[in-house]
Amino acid sequence: MSLHRVLSIYTRAGVTATASPFFSGRVADRASNMAAHNFVPFITNKREKSSGVGLSALAAKKPRVPRQSDSKKPSLVIFDKDGTLICFHSMWVPWTKQTTLKLNEAANLDISHKFYKLLGFCPVEQKVKTGLLAEGTMEQIRQRVVELLVESEVPRASAEQIVHSSVLDCNTSSPETLKQIHDLQGLFKELKTHNVKVAICTADSRKGTMNALQSLGLEKYVDLVVCGDDDGSLPKPHPHNALSICRVLGVDPEDALMVGDTLADMGMGRSANLGTVGVLSGVGDRHELHPHADHLVKHVGELMPLLLGSTQNNQNNMPSTN
């Protein structure tokens, strides 16, 4: 599904939001109002979309500045998926190992070490660190693996075929690998009780994302989903997707919150002028996220007290869990 198509849906006569799986009924009801306000989608840059270099560095460029609305309950929370809602390691470590075996066999080379380094996977700790796998889209990963094979003297045409057959989407619906970090249905229900909209912005594919949400019974609670392979999507930390979500849902970025586990998540939120909450349940650790998040929490289960102001989860006095 095209993000550009979804975002431009309000400017095309005779088309309603119910035609898109992005939307729940609540959002569909707003379609006519959005059209009346001449909603125009953002213009995207394909070259910028394909660039996957230095995501963490980009995210870390801009120092965190306190916002006037930090103490106000948000109208919208945008969640990253893997590492924030779903255990990153239980899903992507098996994928990394299986993909490595496929690449080695197809290329008749042992590129395990290079592939692990490219992705940010530590075979000793059996964990994914900050890097391409944690922050990039599948398109970016495939492009970089092609270049890795070419650098290993594999002809480009062969490298592209190897990647096409070996670097496949992750099976995100398997109960063996799909492990939610918290009671997500309970969390999303509580957000809805307090009239807070819910969106998900992930680098993962749409197929994998929707499979995961359906397996966990979450799709009915989510107002908008933006994925890495949606046409018109730009990778984090670019602010495009966050600003697009805010526009579609009719929320001022100042009244929205980005929740994620990587510098790319924090960078997207900050560059779009959203509040930012870093979670220590995924790839990023306290030392990475601390300078760039308005708040740090151990996991999304600690989010509601923070949003409602019943406890003060100050990032400067919270102990690290890493």
Question: What positions do the PLM features span?
Answer:
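Glycine- and other small-residue-rich loops at beta-strand/loop junctions that grip anionic moieties
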Residues: 176, 201, 234
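Conserved phosphate-coupling serine/threonine residues in phosphotransfer and NTP-handling enzymes
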Residues: 84, 202-204
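N-terminal helical cap/lid subdomain that shapes the substrate entry/recognition surface
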Residues: 54, 58-185, 189-194
